[in-house]
Amino acid sequence: MGKHIIPQRRGHGSLVYRSPSHRHITEVKHVDQGTYVIKDIIHAPGRNAPLLELMGSDGKKAYQIAFTGAFVGQNIVAGNVDSVSPGTTTVLANIPDGSYVYNIESSPGDGGEFCRSAGTFALVVSHGQHVTLKLPSGRMRDFDPRCRATLGVVAASGIKDPPILKAGTHVHYLRSKAKRPYTVRGVAMNAVNHPHGGGNHQHVGRPSTVGRNAPPGRKVGRLSPKRRRVNGR
């Protein structure tokens, strides 16, 4: 009898594949309307961008994804305002064309889903019935004008520039994100461990395409691929 492949083990939810949520500081969403002061810039396990520890005018503590140029003691504003200074959180309808924004809501009130990792930002292209943004992938996407976003660019844009010189450092980095630190090819395994394993030399030995509705133990390789088009046909 064959053994469970990695996606099946991950779906079972053991401690190896479970996110270490006990190390996470908090779930970072948009802050409530008001004026805040940056008290500290802290590292957040599981994230590649730092967090801003904010203190509101009402004395409540809040957290926000840090932006480039933030400093301790800086005042930032959140709400339905027309300010264009970095760190301001407001609705897309108030943000002028050509501005850089991050932590963009997909639907009004969800707290932010787009452009949250280090160094990312989106460009406000145009306003109309919808607000058009150019995402880091180059894709143009329309958003509801009531969706909120924060002006600026996410901090720590150069976090991936220095090389990771030690394998152990990379292991700890990926484990904080509940990711496997290494990948073993299926053709390099034994037949008991993977559908592509076994044989006198490394080869799949059968068509590597599988259907979209294949059972989990067989769903490896090229998943429901589309026929390659030649000359647009």
UniProtKB/Swiss-Prot annotation:
Tagged with keyword Secreted: no
GO MF, one annotated term: structural constituent of ribosome
Any single Pfam family the record assigns to this protein: Ribosomal_L2_C
A Gene Ontology BP annotation from the UniProt entry: cytoplasmic translation
Ribonucleoprotein as UniProt keyword: yes
Region spans: Disordered: 195-233
GO cellular-component term (any): cytosolic large ribosomal subunit
Listed Basic residues bias regions: 219-233
InterPro entries linked to this entry: NA-bd_OB-fold (IPR012340), Rib_uL2_dom2 (IPR014722), Ribosomal_uL2 (IPR002171), Ribosomal_uL2_arc_euk (IPR023672), Ribosomal_uL2_C (IPR022669), Ribosomal_uL2_dom3 (IPR014726), Translation_prot_SH3-like_sf (IPR008991)
Keywords noted in UniProt: Ribonucleoprotein, Ribosomal protein, RNA-binding, rRNA-binding
PANTHER family, alphabetized: LARGE RIBOSOMAL SUBUNIT PROTEIN UL2, RIBOSOMAL PROTEIN L2
NCBIfam families: PRK09612.1
Function: One of the primary rRNA binding proteins. Required for association of the 30S and 50S subunits to form the 70S ribosome, for tRNA binding and peptide bond formation. It has been suggested to have peptidyltransferase activity; this is somewhat controversial. Makes several contacts with the 16S rRNA in the 70S ribosome.
Family in the record: Belongs to the universal ribosomal protein uL2 family.
Assembly and binders: Part of the 50S ribosomal subunit. Forms a bridge to the 30S subunit in the 70S ribosome.
Listed name of the protein: Large ribosomal subunit protein uL2
